[in-house]
Amino acid sequence: NVTGVQTCALPISIPTTVPGLDVCELMPQHAKLAHQYNVVRSVCHTFADHGGGHKRMMTGRIPATPVDTVNDAPCTGSIVAKVREGIDRGIPNYISMNPGGRVNDVFAQGPAYLGQAYLPFNVEGDPTTPRFNVPNIAPTGTSAERVDDRMKLLSGLDRIERQMDGAGVMSSIDKYQQRAVSMLLSDRAKKAFDLSLEPETVRDRYGRHCWGQRALMARRLVEAGVSFVSVVMENPYQSNVPWLKQGVYNWDSHAVNCHIWDDLQVRLPIYDQAVMALIDDVYQRGLDKKTLILVTGEFGRTPRVENSIGTQTGVKQPGRDHWPQAMSMIYAGGGMQTGQVIGSTNSKGEHPADRPLTPNDVWATVYRHLGIDYTMAFPDRRGRPMPILPFGEPIPECLRA
């Protein structure tokens, strides 16, 4: 009963189905299904600010500025959308699901010099609420013939503007139009976003909360042919999860923001249910060879707990600060051999002791899975060729077996 959570004892570790791998007791599904994923323990970088950490993790490039949230290099999803822009399945190749009210660059999901045509198609809000709606995926009172007529008229009207355009703006607009019309004339997107088509038992398995239903929608989108789906699990305190006074909106678990152990009593079971339901479902439905799942944040948290006065509670409470020197993440699916632990840290969890890896290695692995040459380059705004990854190699254990 999340409404009754108070200051609790420290959580303990429990064994998993992988010998030698323990996880927090608040994540029983991670323990039960550990044989279906790999844990990478030794990823590290040097950007401790949220903005710099997001950009470093999501682009595979060293950000020009260590703070703020505007990408100076394209995120991986935008690269995938660029490479696969010729593939039209009536649904975008890059989709992001997030709480809403934020711009894409808050989560370092911007396209930078690739242009606005490679922004993700945003799905905002809480899919569990009755008012949840994905706009612009089906015509409203407009037949396919009328949509076609209007596009022909628009083509004539913008011819002069196109001749005057020297910055490629019209090209980006064209791609938006093509994507929008393709979605309007196909019911693929409408069906993929419609969670009511799922059995109630499946929706229950993912959890009747925003994280669970976003994870379920991600699986449906991949089945519909979307190449890259990003699910932002930021605020669990939405529908069916009452706000906890000593909790925090996101994972920023400084002591001034939250009582970390109380917050995790709510947060981790929701995360555990949503992520493991997705991974297990992907295997049960035979999608594990073509679908690669990556679970990560922008950096780790300090190995040592700090204590400060909480701004919401007014009392001293425990928390953890930013720590990019070492972090763990999960890979699943992708046809890889699972049940592995890759890399290690020193005994205090401070820095890698074995197999130090970077975000570049993380994304080189993803690009390899997608069949994308991770050494390719695209021109920046000055026309200079910019490699999508200036360095890095795929993690062998996380490639197709």
Regions found by a protein language model. Name each.
Residues 5-401:
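Ligand-binding pockets and gating/stacking loops
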